[in-house]
Amino acid sequence: MAKKVITREEEEVRELIRAEDLWEPVGPTPMPKITDLRNWDMRLLKTYKPWYAPFCDLCCLCTYGKCDLTEGRRGACGIDIATQQARIVLLACLMGCSAHAGHAGHILEYLIEKHGPDKKIDLGTFVELEAPNIRTVTGLKPETLGDLKRVIEYVYKEITHLLDSTNSGQEGNYLDYESKALHASMLDHVGMEVADIAQIVGFNFPSSVADTPLVDMGWTSVGKTKPVILVVGHNPGVSTNIIDYLQANKLYDKVEVCGICCTALETTRYADRAKVIGPLSRQLFYVRTGIADVIVTDEQCIRTDIAIEAKKVGSALIAGSDKACYGLPEVSEREADEIVKEMVEEGKQFLILDHELAGEVAVKVAMKLAPQRKKEFVTEKEAQEFAKKCKECGICEMVCPNLFSIGKSMADVAKGNFGKLREVFNKCIGCGKCEEECPRDVPIFKIMQVAASKETYKLRAGRGPVMDTEIRNVGAPLVLGTIPGVIALVGCSNYPDIEDVADMVDEFARRKYIVVLTGCAAMVAGMKKDEEGKTVYEKYPPDFDAGGVVNIGSCVANAHISGAAIKIANIFATLPIRANYELIADYILNRVGACGVAWGAMSQKAASIGTGFNRWGVPVVLGPHSSKYRRLYLSRKEEDDWTVMDGRTRQLVDTKEPSPEHLAYVCETKEKAMVTIPKLCIRKNDTPQGRSIKLNHYISLWKKYMGGGLPDDLHLFVRRKADIPIVFKKEVMAWLKEIGWEEKPALSLPTLIGTYPTKVKLEAVIH
């Protein structure tokens, strides 16, 4: 056989990843291009077929259109409706990936300017396997901030090629668009990892520690008597400089710094006296209270009318990112005091891209403006007068995404009854559509001030990567099934009920699952107290272990969750990860019992985060609004072929077991989610003891939330009698006998390697 010729492009990649470094041999896919992992994608999509729910039946992307794609029609360019939906999915994933990659690139450039490119990456004593996503995808072991720049430039390059494919007259097959969406979303996890590692190193965020501080959360955790600075977004470049300026000028105890969305989480990782108002759903409500003297925005998940809303209530506003300029003049070349004077005396709003200057200006404006402003909550009497304007026309209820009884609540408030409105506020996702559409201009969000809970909650500050020592402790129990699974609650706050997340965390932590959280989900998990007045962060230990509840951090910290799954393959199973994506993803799919839950997913970022988990082989449960993403990855249960390779016997085995059953699945109710999540943690590699534990949870949760009886698909997950939980054995055996259940084939080492064309050798899966 002729020796393979290494191309110039391959040589460049080998140079970029320092292929001569001998920490591991370079695997088959260093810095993979769009088609390098296509066969893996197609194998996944063979089992987990895309299921489309078109949000729109038209294509309006080019001047040939509009084109009606219903009833088998094709557009003027030849595209069909499935391919059009897949293209929109790819565009959404690219938006999400670009948001995180842009964040990563920006914060990386800032920190390189501050510390230099040779700043060493050190994630603490207990994290030796840093950057598992970067290592597995690119083949590079990053040692400095400068190395991270190599990685993010690879991500930028791939994004360009992927976006190219969405132009008119390009890709014509829906499965290939799905493969590209999976590729974009894999890159998203790489970009997120770059961002959070850079932040940990550059800002000295917590790492190699589980017991991070408990910080205050809630809209009344912030005092009205002090100057208040509200930071909104995801990029901590400005917020950390606000803290630095306060500390340098001995003002730290004289000014309140609080946040909404992930900048809040990042700021509490930097300073535990900072406070969290809450998730995205609390943004409009809190801005309209007028409590913030200065609002500082950066990027992502910020209301695009925030400058207008700030002006209405007399809050000063500084935009701190080129991603969201709001039409404001950029003043980084001007003196701080000159900017402050115009903001305080003339009410001007500015774009300030110099983070240090923005931090200084924010503090000075807050201290000058606060004494001039009257901050008062709406009284019950005022709320009653406002509510009397409501004529219960029902328009607010029609436009509410969750169909809440807003009009009836207003009628009650007018009579002095606030109970119904309190229920509405607690579930409100903060979109503001009700007030926007009200024909009588009832100030619904102002009225909500009297109904909103005045309680302060506790949130554990984000802790960053899962430690290698923790992986060593839980690797075997997770793979064998005796720890029933890792549940990762992530994503935005577009919930049907905001308390659902806390209920899920409590249910699964109590059952000794490992529960990890990020972003808005991490916040809302702490916004419910039990009978003893404790949140889940006070009730459960912060360890990555059975029964632990772990706040990993912000949106970009999601990379540490996928990273933990990779670490299990490397640290526990000793599989080589360097440029070895397929091998590791195959291991995770077949042997690591993990399930993501994006219960309030709203943004394109949430779409790419979830799809990135899917490519790794981790299923994701989505909330009811997520059907609007247009696409799910569903199996057909018994109808599908569940044949895998037994890596030890080298024989194909029809397992007859749909595990995991789906990769992306929408649940319409919390109750349905409660029984779906444990089922999606079932893996073919489970030992009889592990499977028995998992089925015990599946059955007991079914009885608790679905009205009793046994799950109608239980027989699909019982391989042998030893899998049946002892407590339900008599009931299950009687039912299995009734339906004619038969034992399933034995399997020693499940893998998809060998069932599709791949460069990965079957021997590689044996460890």
List the predicted regions and their residue ranges.
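Metallocofactor- and cofactor-centric catalytic cores in central/energy metabolism, strongly enriched
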Residues: 2-440, 444-767
